[in-house]
Amino acid sequence: MTHPQQPAEPLYCPPCTPGQVERSATIDLDALEHNVRRLKELIGDRALIAVIKADAYGHGAYPVARSAIAAGADLLGVVHVNEALQLRADGIDAPLMAWLHTPSTDFEAALQEKIRLGVSGWDLEAVAAAAERTGERAIVHLKADTGLGRNG
């Protein structure tokens, strides 16, 4: 498998405050693949989700997604449906899940692209309506606040 020599350009890079040093991090895709394979060995037949939200934390969602899937990740996780739709447009056909939705989230497009959805109670009606309109089956992961004050 070949990998780009340069990390992908981040989606947004705020300018440095005068006097600050610009920071960067580089992902070694071979090391990432090694780590995913090792995790799969440790967890056996359990599913492994590789979270690549926010453009893989600015490292390039597409190359990180390809490497994670090639090494055995079962599912890719992103925050927003638009991130998942971009991965589909880029040719990633692996299972994808998005879990943070806004009133403008395009659930119809998500269902048509077979994107799994992490949903709370208030998302269920919108997802069910989108499934009815598209004729697509929605695969949902229910989110619950377990006391941390977070919904996930």
Regions found by a protein language model. Give the residues of each.
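Active-site-proximal beta-alpha core segment in soluble small-molecule metabolic enzymes
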Residues: 12-13, 19, 23-27, 31-34, ...
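N-terminal amphipathic/basic leader segments beginning at the initiator methionine
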Residues: 2-18
